[in-house]
Amino acid sequence: MAAKEVKFSDDARTRMLRGVNILAHAVKVTLGPKGRNVVLEKSFGAPTVTKDGVSVAKEIELSDKFENMGAQMVKEVASQTSDVAGDGTTTATVLAQSILTEGLKAVAAGMNPMDLKRGIDKAVAAAVDEIHAMSVPCTDSNAIAQVGTISANADESIGKIIAEAMDKVGKEGVITVEDGSGLENQLDIVEGMQFDRGYLSPYFINNQQSMSAELENPFILINEKKISNIRELLPVLEGVAKAGRPLVIVAEDVEGEALATLVVNNMRGILKVAAVKAPGFGDRRKAMLEDIAVLTGGTVISEDIGLSLEKATLADLGTAKKVQITKENTTIIDGAGSSEAIQGRVAQIRKQIEDTTSDYDREKLQERLAKLAGGVAVIKVGAATEVEMKEKKARVEDALHATRAAVEEGIVPGGGVALIRALAKLRDLKGANHDQDVGISIARRAMEEPLRQIVANAGDEPSVVLNKVAEGAGNFGYNAATGEYGDMVAMGILDPAKVTRSALQNAASVASLMITTEAMVAEEPKEEAPMPGGMGGMGGMGDMM
Protein backbone atom coordinates (compact mmCIF):
# COMPACT_ATOMS: atom_id res chain seq x y z
CA MET A 1 0.00 0.00 0.00
CA ALA A 2 1.34 3.45 -0.91
CA ALA A 3 2.41 5.81 1.88
CA LYS A 4 -0.14 8.42 2.93
CA GLU A 5 0.21 12.06 3.84
CA VAL A 6 -2.02 13.30 6.70
CA LYS A 7 -2.94 16.93 7.44
CA PHE A 8 -4.69 18.05 10.62
CA SER A 9 -7.01 20.88 11.78
CA ASP A 10 -6.07 24.37 10.47
CA ASP A 11 -3.49 23.08 8.00
CA ALA A 12 -6.05 20.67 6.46
CA ARG A 13 -8.86 23.23 6.37
CA THR A 14 -6.65 25.95 4.86
CA ARG A 15 -5.54 23.65 2.01
CA MET A 16 -9.16 22.62 1.43
CA LEU A 17 -10.33 26.25 1.34
CA ARG A 18 -7.64 27.09 -1.21
CA GLY A 19 -9.01 24.41 -3.56
CA VAL A 20 -12.59 25.57 -3.00
CA ASN A 21 -11.63 29.16 -3.81
CA ILE A 22 -9.88 28.20 -7.06
CA LEU A 23 -12.95 26.31 -8.29
CA ALA A 24 -15.48 28.86 -7.01
CA HIS A 25 -13.64 31.84 -8.57
CA ALA A 26 -13.65 30.08 -11.96
CA VAL A 27 -17.34 29.17 -11.71
CA LYS A 28 -18.90 32.29 -10.17
CA VAL A 29 -17.80 34.66 -12.94
CA THR A 30 -20.53 33.01 -15.08
CA LEU A 31 -23.40 34.04 -12.73
CA GLY A 32 -26.15 36.40 -13.89
CA PRO A 33 -27.15 38.00 -17.20
CA LYS A 34 -23.79 39.78 -17.47
CA GLY A 35 -21.84 36.64 -16.50
CA ARG A 36 -18.43 36.32 -18.17
CA ASN A 37 -17.24 33.51 -20.43
CA VAL A 38 -14.84 30.75 -19.41
CA VAL A 39 -12.67 29.07 -22.06
CA LEU A 40 -12.05 25.34 -21.58
CA GLU A 41 -9.15 23.59 -23.29
CA LYS A 42 -9.99 20.36 -25.13
CA SER A 43 -7.55 17.50 -25.76
CA PHE A 44 -8.16 17.97 -29.50
CA GLY A 45 -9.95 20.53 -31.62
CA ALA A 46 -10.98 24.05 -30.71
CA PRO A 47 -11.45 25.10 -27.07
CA THR A 48 -15.00 25.32 -25.68
CA VAL A 49 -16.38 28.70 -24.64
CA THR A 50 -19.09 28.48 -21.99
CA LYS A 51 -21.18 30.39 -19.45
CA ASP A 52 -22.45 27.17 -17.86
CA GLY A 53 -21.21 26.82 -14.27
CA VAL A 54 -21.38 23.04 -14.08
CA SER A 55 -19.38 22.62 -17.32
CA VAL A 56 -16.60 24.76 -15.81
CA ALA A 57 -16.70 22.88 -12.48
CA LYS A 58 -16.42 19.49 -14.22
CA GLU A 59 -13.19 20.53 -15.95
CA ILE A 60 -11.31 21.51 -12.78
CA GLU A 61 -8.73 19.07 -11.39
CA LEU A 62 -5.93 20.44 -9.16
CA SER A 63 -2.39 19.04 -8.80
CA ASP A 64 -2.27 19.41 -4.97
CA LYS A 65 -4.20 16.42 -3.53
CA PHE A 66 -5.58 18.32 -0.51
CA GLU A 67 -6.65 21.37 -2.51
CA ASN A 68 -8.23 19.02 -5.04
CA MET A 69 -10.30 17.33 -2.31
CA GLY A 70 -11.82 20.71 -1.43
CA ALA A 71 -12.52 21.49 -5.09
CA GLN A 72 -14.11 18.06 -5.66
CA MET A 73 -16.43 18.48 -2.66
CA VAL A 74 -17.76 21.76 -4.04
CA LYS A 75 -18.01 20.17 -7.49
CA GLU A 76 -20.29 17.64 -5.76
CA VAL A 77 -22.52 20.53 -4.58
CA ALA A 78 -22.84 21.76 -8.16
CA SER A 79 -23.57 18.35 -9.69
CA GLN A 80 -25.99 17.38 -6.89
CA THR A 81 -27.97 20.60 -7.43
CA SER A 82 -27.91 20.02 -11.19
CA ASP A 83 -29.19 16.43 -10.74
CA VAL A 84 -32.05 17.44 -8.42
CA ALA A 85 -33.15 20.74 -9.96
CA GLY A 86 -31.31 20.90 -13.29
CA ASP A 87 -29.92 24.37 -12.67
CA GLY A 88 -28.58 26.59 -9.86
CA THR A 89 -25.09 25.10 -9.98
CA THR A 90 -23.30 28.46 -9.91
CA THR A 91 -25.55 29.78 -7.12
CA ALA A 92 -24.83 26.63 -5.06
CA THR A 93 -21.07 27.08 -5.57
CA VAL A 94 -21.20 30.75 -4.51
CA LEU A 95 -23.21 29.86 -1.38
CA ALA A 96 -20.89 26.97 -0.44
CA GLN A 97 -17.77 29.14 -0.80
CA SER A 98 -19.25 31.88 1.38
CA ILE A 99 -20.45 29.51 4.15
CA LEU A 100 -17.06 27.75 4.20
CA THR A 101 -14.96 30.95 4.20
CA GLU A 102 -16.92 32.56 7.06
CA GLY A 103 -17.21 29.23 8.90
CA LEU A 104 -13.45 28.60 8.88
CA LYS A 105 -12.82 32.14 10.19
CA ALA A 106 -15.16 31.36 13.11
CA VAL A 107 -13.43 28.00 13.79
CA ALA A 108 -10.03 29.74 13.76
CA ALA A 109 -11.42 32.23 16.31
CA GLY A 110 -12.18 29.32 18.67
CA MET A 111 -15.85 28.55 17.95
CA ASN A 112 -17.18 25.01 18.22
CA PRO A 113 -17.56 23.60 14.66
CA MET A 114 -20.51 21.35 15.64
CA ASP A 115 -22.46 24.29 17.09
CA LEU A 116 -21.69 26.35 13.97
CA LYS A 117 -23.11 23.49 11.88
CA ARG A 118 -26.27 23.34 14.03
CA GLY A 119 -26.76 27.10 13.62
CA ILE A 120 -26.27 26.91 9.82
CA ASP A 121 -28.74 23.99 9.56
CA LYS A 122 -31.31 25.89 11.64
CA ALA A 123 -31.03 28.99 9.43
CA VAL A 124 -31.26 26.96 6.19
CA ALA A 125 -34.38 25.09 7.39
CA ALA A 126 -36.10 28.42 8.21
CA ALA A 127 -35.03 29.95 4.86
CA VAL A 128 -36.34 26.91 2.90
CA ASP A 129 -39.74 27.23 4.64
CA GLU A 130 -39.83 30.89 3.61
CA ILE A 131 -38.89 30.07 -0.02
CA HIS A 132 -41.77 27.57 -0.14
CA ALA A 133 -44.13 30.18 1.32
CA MET A 134 -43.25 32.83 -1.29
CA SER A 135 -43.33 30.48 -4.32
CA VAL A 136 -46.13 31.00 -6.86
CA PRO A 137 -47.41 28.14 -9.09
CA CYS A 138 -45.98 28.31 -12.64
CA THR A 139 -48.80 27.45 -15.04
CA ASP A 140 -48.92 29.86 -17.98
CA SER A 141 -46.56 29.52 -20.92
CA ASN A 142 -45.35 33.11 -20.54
CA ALA A 143 -43.89 32.36 -17.09
CA ILE A 144 -42.40 29.08 -18.39
CA ALA A 145 -40.74 30.98 -21.27
CA GLN A 146 -39.29 33.54 -18.84
CA VAL A 147 -37.83 30.83 -16.57
CA GLY A 148 -36.27 29.14 -19.62
CA THR A 149 -34.86 32.46 -20.87
CA ILE A 150 -33.19 33.25 -17.52
CA SER A 151 -31.70 29.77 -17.22
CA ALA A 152 -30.37 29.90 -20.81
CA ASN A 153 -28.38 33.06 -19.96
CA ALA A 154 -31.03 35.50 -21.26
CA ASP A 155 -31.55 33.75 -24.62
CA GLU A 156 -35.23 34.45 -25.40
CA SER A 157 -35.42 32.05 -28.35
CA ILE A 158 -34.63 29.10 -26.05
CA GLY A 159 -37.25 30.15 -23.48
CA LYS A 160 -39.91 30.48 -26.19
CA ILE A 161 -39.21 27.13 -27.84
CA ILE A 162 -39.33 25.28 -24.48
CA ALA A 163 -42.65 26.95 -23.58
CA GLU A 164 -44.02 26.00 -27.01
CA ALA A 165 -42.86 22.39 -26.55
CA MET A 166 -44.53 22.18 -23.12
CA ASP A 167 -47.72 23.64 -24.61
CA LYS A 168 -47.77 20.94 -27.28
CA VAL A 169 -46.93 17.83 -25.25
CA GLY A 170 -48.10 18.90 -21.79
CA LYS A 171 -46.15 19.12 -18.54
CA GLU A 172 -45.68 15.33 -18.47
CA GLY A 173 -44.54 15.05 -22.09
CA VAL A 174 -41.05 13.99 -23.06
CA ILE A 175 -38.93 16.81 -24.50
CA THR A 176 -35.60 15.74 -25.96
CA VAL A 177 -32.72 17.92 -27.21
CA GLU A 178 -30.81 16.98 -30.38
CA ASP A 179 -28.28 18.55 -32.76
CA GLY A 180 -30.04 20.42 -35.56
CA SER A 181 -28.85 20.89 -39.12
CA GLY A 182 -29.70 24.59 -39.64
CA LEU A 183 -28.80 27.87 -37.94
CA GLU A 184 -32.12 28.28 -36.09
CA ASN A 185 -33.63 26.16 -33.31
CA GLN A 186 -36.48 23.92 -34.53
CA LEU A 187 -39.30 22.14 -32.73
CA ASP A 188 -40.62 18.78 -33.98
CA ILE A 189 -43.71 17.26 -32.36
CA VAL A 190 -44.42 13.53 -32.49
CA GLU A 191 -48.12 12.94 -31.92
CA GLY A 192 -49.30 9.69 -30.35
CA MET A 193 -47.03 6.88 -29.22
CA GLN A 194 -43.76 6.38 -31.03
CA PHE A 195 -41.27 3.56 -30.48
CA ASP A 196 -37.95 2.84 -32.17
CA ARG A 197 -38.80 -0.19 -34.30
CA GLY A 198 -39.45 -0.08 -38.06
CA TYR A 199 -41.11 -2.39 -40.59
CA LEU A 200 -39.81 -5.98 -40.83
CA SER A 201 -39.89 -5.94 -44.64
CA PRO A 202 -39.65 -3.05 -47.14
CA TYR A 203 -42.48 -4.74 -49.09
CA PHE A 204 -44.91 -3.35 -46.48
CA ILE A 205 -44.26 0.22 -47.76
CA ASN A 206 -47.36 1.78 -49.34
CA ASN A 207 -46.28 5.44 -49.44
CA GLN A 208 -43.32 5.65 -51.83
CA GLN A 209 -42.83 9.37 -51.25
CA SER A 210 -42.14 9.11 -47.51
CA MET A 211 -40.92 5.48 -47.77
CA SER A 212 -43.33 4.43 -45.04
CA ALA A 213 -46.23 2.07 -44.41
CA GLU A 214 -49.34 4.10 -43.50
CA LEU A 215 -52.45 2.23 -42.35
CA GLU A 216 -55.73 4.03 -41.66
CA ASN A 217 -58.03 2.69 -38.92
CA PRO A 218 -56.16 -0.64 -38.57
CA PHE A 219 -56.58 -3.54 -36.17
CA ILE A 220 -53.46 -4.01 -34.01
CA LEU A 221 -52.35 -7.50 -32.98
CA ILE A 222 -49.99 -7.42 -29.97
CA ASN A 223 -48.16 -10.73 -29.53
CA GLU A 224 -45.45 -11.42 -26.94
CA LYS A 225 -43.73 -14.31 -28.73
CA LYS A 226 -42.20 -14.90 -32.18
CA ILE A 227 -44.53 -15.76 -35.05
CA SER A 228 -43.03 -18.16 -37.59
CA ASN A 229 -45.92 -20.52 -38.37
CA ILE A 230 -48.66 -18.99 -40.55
CA ARG A 231 -51.25 -21.51 -39.25
CA GLU A 232 -51.19 -19.75 -35.85
CA LEU A 233 -52.12 -16.49 -37.56
CA LEU A 234 -54.85 -17.77 -39.90
CA PRO A 235 -57.90 -17.28 -37.60
CA VAL A 236 -56.93 -13.62 -36.98
CA LEU A 237 -56.12 -12.95 -40.65
CA GLU A 238 -59.47 -14.38 -41.80
CA GLY A 239 -61.39 -12.26 -39.26
CA VAL A 240 -59.54 -9.08 -40.27
CA ALA A 241 -60.03 -9.80 -44.02
CA LYS A 242 -63.79 -10.21 -43.47
CA ALA A 243 -63.90 -6.90 -41.61
CA GLY A 244 -62.14 -5.28 -44.59
CA ARG A 245 -59.64 -3.33 -42.46
CA PRO A 246 -55.81 -3.24 -42.39
CA LEU A 247 -53.75 -5.09 -39.75
CA VAL A 248 -50.61 -4.11 -37.84
CA ILE A 249 -48.74 -6.91 -36.07
CA VAL A 250 -46.46 -6.04 -33.13
CA ALA A 251 -44.56 -9.17 -32.01
CA GLU A 252 -41.14 -10.25 -30.69
CA ASP A 253 -40.43 -11.19 -34.32
CA VAL A 254 -42.23 -12.37 -37.46
CA GLU A 255 -40.12 -14.69 -39.61
CA GLY A 256 -40.06 -17.53 -42.12
CA GLU A 257 -43.27 -18.54 -43.86
CA ALA A 258 -45.38 -16.24 -41.67
CA LEU A 259 -43.52 -13.13 -42.90
CA ALA A 260 -43.47 -14.42 -46.51
CA THR A 261 -47.25 -15.02 -46.48
CA LEU A 262 -47.95 -11.55 -45.04
CA VAL A 263 -45.75 -9.92 -47.71
CA VAL A 264 -47.46 -11.84 -50.55
CA ASN A 265 -50.96 -10.99 -49.24
CA ASN A 266 -49.98 -7.33 -48.94
CA MET A 267 -48.48 -7.12 -52.45
CA ARG A 268 -51.52 -8.80 -54.05
CA GLY A 269 -53.86 -6.44 -52.22
CA ILE A 270 -55.71 -9.29 -50.47
CA LEU A 271 -54.97 -7.84 -47.04
CA LYS A 272 -53.28 -4.54 -46.11
CA VAL A 273 -50.82 -5.56 -43.43
CA ALA A 274 -47.53 -4.50 -41.80
CA ALA A 275 -45.42 -6.16 -39.11
CA VAL A 276 -42.97 -4.61 -36.61
CA LYS A 277 -40.79 -5.96 -33.82
CA ALA A 278 -41.88 -5.22 -30.25
CA PRO A 279 -39.93 -2.37 -28.58
CA GLY A 280 -37.55 -2.85 -25.63
CA PHE A 281 -36.10 -6.02 -24.10
CA GLY A 282 -37.02 -8.44 -21.30
CA ASP A 283 -39.39 -7.12 -18.64
CA ARG A 284 -39.36 -3.65 -20.18
CA ARG A 285 -40.67 -5.16 -23.45
CA LYS A 286 -43.59 -6.79 -21.59
CA ALA A 287 -44.43 -3.47 -19.92
CA MET A 288 -44.27 -1.56 -23.23
CA LEU A 289 -46.50 -4.10 -24.99
CA GLU A 290 -48.98 -3.67 -22.14
CA ASP A 291 -48.79 0.13 -22.67
CA ILE A 292 -49.59 -0.32 -26.38
CA ALA A 293 -52.50 -2.61 -25.46
CA VAL A 294 -53.93 -0.03 -23.01
CA LEU A 295 -53.50 2.78 -25.56
CA THR A 296 -55.22 0.87 -28.38
CA GLY A 297 -57.85 -0.97 -26.32
CA GLY A 298 -56.40 -4.39 -27.15
CA THR A 299 -55.00 -7.36 -25.21
CA VAL A 300 -51.43 -8.68 -25.20
CA ILE A 301 -51.53 -12.25 -26.58
CA SER A 302 -49.37 -13.93 -23.95
CA GLU A 303 -49.06 -17.42 -22.50
CA ASP A 304 -48.77 -15.82 -19.05
CA ILE A 305 -52.51 -15.05 -19.16
CA GLY A 306 -53.45 -18.23 -21.02
CA LEU A 307 -54.01 -16.62 -24.43
CA SER A 308 -52.65 -18.16 -27.62
CA LEU A 309 -52.64 -16.84 -31.19
CA GLU A 310 -54.94 -19.61 -32.49
CA LYS A 311 -57.63 -18.62 -29.98
CA ALA A 312 -57.33 -14.85 -30.50
CA THR A 313 -60.41 -13.05 -31.85
CA LEU A 314 -61.03 -9.54 -33.21
CA ALA A 315 -62.09 -8.54 -29.67
CA ASP A 316 -58.48 -9.10 -28.51
CA LEU A 317 -57.08 -6.71 -31.14
CA GLY A 318 -56.50 -3.02 -30.51
CA THR A 319 -57.41 -0.26 -32.95
CA ALA A 320 -56.14 3.23 -33.75
CA LYS A 321 -56.99 6.07 -36.12
CA LYS A 322 -53.68 5.68 -37.94
CA VAL A 323 -50.39 3.80 -37.71
CA GLN A 324 -47.30 5.10 -39.50
CA ILE A 325 -44.24 2.85 -39.86
CA THR A 326 -40.89 4.01 -41.25
CA LYS A 327 -37.58 2.15 -41.51
CA GLU A 328 -36.69 3.12 -37.93
CA ASN A 329 -39.87 4.15 -36.08
CA THR A 330 -43.50 3.20 -35.56
CA THR A 331 -46.07 5.82 -34.53
CA ILE A 332 -49.55 4.92 -33.25
CA ILE A 333 -51.86 7.95 -33.57
CA ASP A 334 -55.10 8.28 -31.61
CA GLY A 335 -55.39 4.80 -30.06
CA ALA A 336 -58.91 3.60 -29.20
CA GLY A 337 -58.17 2.70 -25.55
CA SER A 338 -60.57 4.04 -22.91
CA SER A 339 -59.39 7.18 -21.09
CA GLU A 340 -60.05 5.47 -17.69
CA ALA A 341 -57.70 2.59 -18.57
CA ILE A 342 -55.04 5.01 -19.85
CA GLN A 343 -55.29 7.19 -16.71
CA GLY A 344 -55.05 4.06 -14.54
CA ARG A 345 -51.91 2.97 -16.38
CA VAL A 346 -50.43 6.50 -16.09
CA ALA A 347 -51.07 6.49 -12.30
CA GLN A 348 -49.37 3.08 -12.03
CA ILE A 349 -46.26 4.31 -13.90
CA ARG A 350 -46.14 7.49 -11.76
CA LYS A 351 -46.08 5.31 -8.63
CA GLN A 352 -43.20 3.28 -10.09
CA ILE A 353 -41.31 6.54 -10.82
CA GLU A 354 -41.70 7.58 -7.16
CA ASP A 355 -40.54 4.18 -5.88
CA THR A 356 -37.55 3.54 -8.16
CA THR A 357 -34.00 4.29 -6.97
CA SER A 358 -32.31 3.91 -10.38
CA ASP A 359 -31.89 7.04 -12.51
CA TYR A 360 -31.90 4.92 -15.68
CA ASP A 361 -35.16 3.20 -14.73
CA ARG A 362 -36.70 6.55 -13.83
CA GLU A 363 -35.77 8.01 -17.23
CA LYS A 364 -37.26 5.02 -19.07
CA LEU A 365 -40.45 5.14 -16.95
CA GLN A 366 -40.82 8.86 -17.68
CA GLU A 367 -40.51 8.13 -21.41
CA ARG A 368 -43.27 5.52 -21.14
CA LEU A 369 -45.41 7.95 -19.15
CA ALA A 370 -45.00 10.65 -21.78
CA LYS A 371 -45.90 8.30 -24.61
CA LEU A 372 -49.16 7.47 -22.84
CA ALA A 373 -49.97 10.90 -21.39
CA GLY A 374 -48.91 13.44 -24.00
CA GLY A 375 -46.45 12.97 -26.78
CA VAL A 376 -42.83 13.65 -27.60
CA ALA A 377 -41.28 16.99 -28.58
CA VAL A 378 -37.80 17.18 -30.09
CA ILE A 379 -35.90 20.49 -29.89
CA LYS A 380 -33.27 20.60 -32.64
CA VAL A 381 -30.58 23.10 -31.68
CA GLY A 382 -29.25 25.19 -34.55
CA ALA A 383 -25.83 26.89 -34.59
CA ALA A 384 -23.17 28.11 -37.01
CA THR A 385 -20.26 26.06 -35.64
CA GLU A 386 -19.78 22.86 -33.65
CA VAL A 387 -18.34 24.77 -30.68
CA GLU A 388 -21.40 27.04 -30.56
CA MET A 389 -23.68 23.98 -30.98
CA LYS A 390 -22.22 22.23 -27.90
CA GLU A 391 -22.48 25.37 -25.76
CA LYS A 392 -26.03 26.13 -26.91
CA LYS A 393 -27.17 22.54 -26.41
CA ALA A 394 -25.91 22.59 -22.81
CA ARG A 395 -27.87 25.81 -22.19
CA VAL A 396 -31.06 24.36 -23.72
CA GLU A 397 -30.77 21.29 -21.48
CA ASP A 398 -30.25 23.52 -18.41
CA ALA A 399 -33.25 25.66 -19.32
CA LEU A 400 -35.39 22.58 -19.86
CA HIS A 401 -34.53 21.23 -16.39
CA ALA A 402 -35.21 24.64 -14.84
CA THR A 403 -38.66 24.92 -16.44
CA ARG A 404 -39.54 21.41 -15.23
CA ALA A 405 -38.47 22.44 -11.71
CA ALA A 406 -40.62 25.60 -11.98
CA VAL A 407 -43.69 23.58 -12.97
CA GLU A 408 -43.02 21.20 -10.05
CA GLU A 409 -42.53 23.60 -7.10
CA GLY A 410 -43.47 27.03 -8.46
CA ILE A 411 -41.45 30.18 -9.05
CA VAL A 412 -39.90 32.92 -6.89
CA PRO A 413 -38.43 36.32 -7.87
CA GLY A 414 -35.02 35.80 -9.49
CA GLY A 415 -31.74 37.68 -9.40
CA GLY A 416 -30.93 36.57 -5.82
CA VAL A 417 -34.01 38.42 -4.45
CA ALA A 418 -35.73 35.29 -3.05
CA LEU A 419 -32.75 34.64 -0.75
CA ILE A 420 -32.71 38.29 0.40
CA ARG A 421 -36.43 38.09 1.30
CA ALA A 422 -35.92 34.76 3.09
CA LEU A 423 -32.97 36.28 4.93
CA ALA A 424 -35.20 39.03 6.36
CA LYS A 425 -37.22 36.32 8.16
CA LEU A 426 -34.08 35.07 9.92
CA ARG A 427 -33.48 38.32 11.84
CA ASP A 428 -35.24 37.05 14.97
CA LEU A 429 -33.92 33.48 14.71
CA LYS A 430 -31.83 32.50 17.76
CA GLY A 431 -29.69 29.43 18.47
CA ALA A 432 -29.22 27.58 21.76
CA ASN A 433 -25.87 29.32 22.42
CA HIS A 434 -23.54 32.00 21.06
CA ASP A 435 -21.75 29.67 18.63
CA GLN A 436 -25.07 28.62 17.06
CA ASP A 437 -25.98 32.31 16.68
CA VAL A 438 -22.70 32.78 14.78
CA GLY A 439 -23.70 29.81 12.53
CA ILE A 440 -27.03 31.54 11.79
CA SER A 441 -25.26 34.80 10.91
CA ILE A 442 -22.84 32.86 8.61
CA ALA A 443 -25.83 31.47 6.68
CA ARG A 444 -27.40 34.95 6.50
CA ARG A 445 -24.18 36.46 5.13
CA ALA A 446 -23.95 33.67 2.53
CA MET A 447 -27.52 34.28 1.34
CA GLU A 448 -26.49 37.81 0.27
CA GLU A 449 -23.64 36.45 -1.82
CA PRO A 450 -25.48 35.43 -5.05
CA LEU A 451 -26.92 38.97 -5.42
CA ARG A 452 -23.49 40.50 -4.70
CA GLN A 453 -21.89 38.27 -7.36
CA ILE A 454 -24.56 39.02 -10.00
CA VAL A 455 -24.03 42.76 -9.41
CA ALA A 456 -20.22 42.46 -9.42
CA ASN A 457 -20.30 40.53 -12.74
CA ALA A 458 -22.46 43.33 -14.19
CA GLY A 459 -19.80 45.88 -13.17
CA ASP A 460 -21.85 47.65 -10.46
CA GLU A 461 -21.29 48.23 -6.73
CA PRO A 462 -22.60 45.19 -4.76
CA SER A 463 -23.07 46.88 -1.35
CA VAL A 464 -25.11 49.79 -2.75
CA VAL A 465 -27.44 47.49 -4.71
CA LEU A 466 -27.76 45.03 -1.81
CA ASN A 467 -28.87 47.77 0.62
CA LYS A 468 -31.42 49.16 -1.82
CA VAL A 469 -32.90 45.69 -2.54
CA ALA A 470 -32.99 44.85 1.19
CA GLU A 471 -34.92 48.09 1.90
CA GLY A 472 -37.58 47.05 -0.66
CA ALA A 473 -40.23 44.37 -0.18
CA GLY A 474 -41.87 41.53 -2.10
CA ASN A 475 -40.61 41.16 -5.67
CA PHE A 476 -38.58 44.40 -5.68
CA GLY A 477 -35.09 43.73 -6.99
CA TYR A 478 -32.27 44.71 -9.34
CA ASN A 479 -32.24 43.81 -13.04
CA ALA A 480 -28.52 43.41 -13.79
CA ALA A 481 -29.18 43.17 -17.55
CA THR A 482 -30.56 46.74 -17.73
CA GLY A 483 -29.26 48.25 -14.47
CA GLU A 484 -32.83 49.08 -13.32
CA TYR A 485 -34.71 48.41 -10.09
CA GLY A 486 -38.31 47.15 -10.08
CA ASP A 487 -40.69 44.22 -9.76
CA MET A 488 -38.63 41.16 -10.76
CA VAL A 489 -41.67 39.05 -11.68
CA ALA A 490 -43.10 41.82 -13.89
CA MET A 491 -39.67 42.14 -15.58
CA GLY A 492 -39.72 38.38 -16.21
CA ILE A 493 -36.77 37.59 -13.93
CA LEU A 494 -37.88 34.38 -12.24
CA ASP A 495 -36.19 31.41 -10.59
CA PRO A 496 -37.76 28.01 -9.91
CA ALA A 497 -38.29 27.64 -6.13
CA LYS A 498 -36.81 24.13 -6.36
CA VAL A 499 -33.54 25.47 -7.81
CA THR A 500 -33.11 28.15 -5.10
CA ARG A 501 -34.02 25.68 -2.34
CA SER A 502 -31.74 22.88 -3.61
CA ALA A 503 -28.79 25.25 -4.10
CA LEU A 504 -29.06 26.50 -0.50
CA GLN A 505 -29.57 23.05 1.06
CA ASN A 506 -26.75 21.34 -0.88
CA ALA A 507 -24.30 24.21 -0.33
CA ALA A 508 -24.99 24.28 3.43
CA SER A 509 -24.74 20.49 3.67
CA VAL A 510 -21.29 20.21 2.05
CA ALA A 511 -19.88 23.43 3.57
CA SER A 512 -20.93 22.23 7.06
CA LEU A 513 -19.10 18.94 6.47
CA MET A 514 -15.97 20.85 5.50
CA ILE A 515 -16.17 23.15 8.53
CA THR A 516 -16.28 20.08 10.81
CA THR A 517 -13.31 18.40 9.05
CA GLU A 518 -10.41 17.74 11.44
CA ALA A 519 -8.06 15.59 9.32
CA MET A 520 -7.36 14.87 5.65
CA VAL A 521 -5.55 11.84 4.22
CA ALA A 522 -4.07 11.63 0.73
CA GLU A 523 -1.44 9.60 -1.10
CA GLU A 524 2.06 11.03 -0.92
CA PRO A 525 3.15 12.43 -4.28
CA LYS A 526 5.49 10.00 -6.05
CA GLU A 527 8.91 11.28 -7.00
CA GLU A 528 9.38 10.67 -10.70
CA ALA A 529 12.73 9.01 -11.51
CA PRO A 530 14.81 11.07 -13.94
CA MET A 531 14.96 9.85 -17.53
CA PRO A 532 18.12 7.79 -18.31
CA GLY A 533 20.83 9.65 -20.22
CA GLY A 534 21.23 9.11 -23.97
CA MET A 535 24.18 7.22 -25.48
CA GLY A 536 27.39 9.16 -25.81
CA GLY A 537 28.58 10.32 -29.21
CA MET A 538 30.67 7.78 -31.12
CA GLY A 539 33.68 9.99 -31.70
CA GLY A 540 36.69 9.01 -33.77
CA MET A 541 34.72 7.14 -36.40
CA GLY A 542 36.03 9.51 -39.04
CA ASP A 543 39.53 7.95 -38.91
CA MET A 544 38.16 4.66 -40.22
CA MET A 545 37.61 6.07 -43.68
Curated annotation (Swiss-Prot):
HAMAP family with a match to the protein in the record: CH60
Purpose: Together with its co-chaperonin GroES, plays an essential role in assisting protein folding. The GroEL-GroES system forms a nano-cage that allows encapsulation of the non-native substrate proteins and provides a physical environment optimized to promote and accelerate protein folding.
Annotated binding of ATP, by residue: 30-33, 51, 87-91, 415, 479-481, 495
GO MF term list: ATP binding; ATP-dependent protein folding chaperone; isomerase activity; unfolded protein binding
Keyword Cytoplasm: yes
Top EC group: isomerase
Major site of localization recorded for this protein: cytoplasm
Family: Belongs to the chaperonin (HSP60) family.
Protein name, as recorded: Chaperonin GroEL 1
Claim: Cell inner membrane is one of the keywords in the record: no
Keywords, alphabetical: ATP-binding, Chaperone, Cytoplasm, Isomerase, Nucleotide-binding
UniProt GO cellular component terms: cytoplasm
Chemical reaction(s) catalysed: ATP + H2O + a folded polypeptide = ADP + phosphate + an unfolded polypeptide
Subunit structure and binding partners: Forms a cylinder of 14 subunits composed of two heptameric rings stacked back-to-back. Interacts with the co-chaperonin GroES.
Originating gene: groEL1
GO biological process: protein refolding
CDD domains: GroEL
Entry EC number(s): 5.6.1.7
Subcellular location: Cytoplasm
Pfam families: Cpn60_TCP1
